[in-house]
Amino acid sequence: MFKKVSAALLAAVVAGSALAVANAAESTGKGALDFTIDSPYKNVNWETFGQYKADFHAHSNESDGSPQPFDTVEEHYRKGYDVLALTDHNVTNTTWNRKDDPTGKGRTYLTDERYNEITNGTDRGGRGMVAIKNSDEQSKSDHLNTFFTPFNNSDGATLESNIAKCQELGGICHINHPGRYTGGKNTSGTAGEDASNNHATIQKYVDLFMKYDSCVGMEIINKLDGDSYSDRILWDNILEETMEDGRFVWGFSNDDTHSNAATGHSYNMMLMPENTATNVRAAMESGAFYASAKVAKREGYTNTNIDEINSYQPPVITNISVDDAEDTITIEGNYYNTVEWIADGEIIATGNTIDLNDYEGKINSYVRAQLKGNEGISFTQPFGVKSDIAGKANLSVDKNTVVVENDNKTVTCTVSVTNVLGANAFDAKLSYDSEVFEVAEVKALTEDTVISSDKSTDGTARMIIGTQTPVNGAADVMQVVLKVKEDAKTGITSLSLDSLNTTVSVTSDIFEGLLTVADGAKDIEVISYRELSDVNNDGEVTLKDLSLAVKNYRPENAAYDIDRSGVVDTADLIIIASYIA
């Protein structure tokens, strides 16, 4: 993967290169960088998978909600939910038809008959609603929803200790409404934004996500976007840090239901082959879902009148496709007007398709999309992005055989590049066996070379090169002439293009990285005509050796092919005869 370097460091070399890159990119349709896209939707079959509406944060009067537990379940079922986690504060939800009384408050749960009807969907066309069991909003500290985990926190618990316990027990969790604790919920001026951009705050969450992989994500929408007002800002800040190490943090949208009326406005669409608790967990872990909301205040959806928004339909995503060869992501859907693409917290593009090459310098480790419609917004999960300098490096040689008796016992090696765009600085390294070869010459082959610094050491030919004319397409970069040493042993020896580091200029940034070596290994045979002429290996060249070669005249027999031409011919016989005393 490339790294950014300061433009000032190479100012003398890169003058005019940005314009050259822009012109070349326009003509080729590709960029200076080659992207690898890691999509959380890569295993989703959009034609056969179902989309299942899920709420992972809901309350009843087991804690501070108003409905009975059975009614919270019924309301979600009535409103078309397919998945529900009942997450009362500090109460472990075991099953919706439980017979015990965990709170001692005499609460009412589903009957066994009704439980079976709802989970099997017998009165909803067979579309059952899946119960996420052993769920709990651990609330002794910053709130954390734990799933598939039979435990309840105790006094003195912290956010981290609850995450650690969840992981120890084999469950998963997500962090709830962080803006309540960070100050991100503050809507006064830039207070919420400033709180979500606070470095110490960001680092706190980054550290937790990096330490505990069972903490799969965080709420980016909670209820009608009250506490979560600035949590998308925090999410992007976290992603900037974690995605560099390949750590995805999924964004969840939940009603945090405390009343029946507050149900149905913020939810997650799980993409699964079948609606089962096992598949739900797999989707929560892999990111195979998107988050939808009718209210997202920073994005312009500010109507919180429940009577008005009850019938709203946020955008539905119907397909996401990634073309790694073209470095593109395409989204299709319904109920939307525009698709915005976000990297490092900034909207960088709009439209159904993003070509990452069009936004080089703006995309680092991730990009995500949000679909905006008249009645709400839907957020994709982040796509992981890794980038390398586009192009390939190659090694070629002028010969594959060197004769020690010849005056010209050298091999000329050429290091070249293909399909690069705007490359103007190179660091090429070629390794060889120092017991066989010595370097006779190293030189730059680039056009308008302004600097060539020989950094060769014993066994390695290396040169740093800078050119005023950036390379677009294919070019030879470095030439190395290797000479066979006088005391070199005969046999096969290998040459290797170890690396070719280069830079490209993209807008105001310079990117440095290794080109992929497409063809970088060459075997060279060092031969002695005198040794090979002794075909019977008796220590001397005599008529016997010539006789054997004559008998094998013309067949493709390497033992008698002295000059390595591919056939035994007159030239081989002449060589043998020349060594007969």
Name every feature range the model reports, one short phrase each.
Residues 1-26, 480, 535, 549, ...:
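Gram-positive cell-envelope targeting signals
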Residues 29-193, 223-234, 254-257, 279, ...:
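A metal-dependent hydrolase metal-coordination microenvironment
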Residues 104-107, 365-372, 415, 575-576:
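Append "Rare intracellular matches occur via the same short Y/T/C beta-strand/loop motifs
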Residues 389-531:
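Acidic, low-complexity intrinsically disordered segments
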Residues 498, 535-557, 565-581:
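Alpha-helical segments with a strong preference for the paired helices of cellulosomal dockerin domains
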